[in-house]
């Protein structure tokens, strides 16, 4: 390990401790889990990504989401509100959660999240035919942040 890598190794743990607000004991537990080291080693590359969920179907949406609307998230899964529609339906976000989780798991495993086979999810509203109001279907894509 070169000097730069050694320095980063020290800094990253201090940064994570401060970022997560961990006590020394919590940080000890965190560091003892080898999965956390693996995830942190891949975090810089993931943070260069933008997760995009595009509305590919919409009918009767109370929040007025339309086909082509996009919801943007950073690589860690945080909603980038300034890039999203003015109103974002919580039920659409609920549909986004498992897709973002799966895309991050694939990324950490070294697999391109865009290769996900089932990359669509729908809001919880069943649509008017089933006693609801509307329905929105989202499709996930992951791109370089500079392209988003």
Question: Where is each model-derived feature located?
Answer:
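Beta-strand secondary-structure signal
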Residues: 50-54, 137-139
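Acidic, aromatic-enriched beta-alpha/helix-loop junctions
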Residues: 69-111
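Short, basic/aromatic beta-hairpin or loop at an interaction surface
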Residues: 40-52
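Glycine- and charge-enriched low-complexity intrinsically disordered segments
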Residues: 2-34, 94-148
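Short alpha-helix capping/helix-loop boundary micro-motifs
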Residues: 55-60
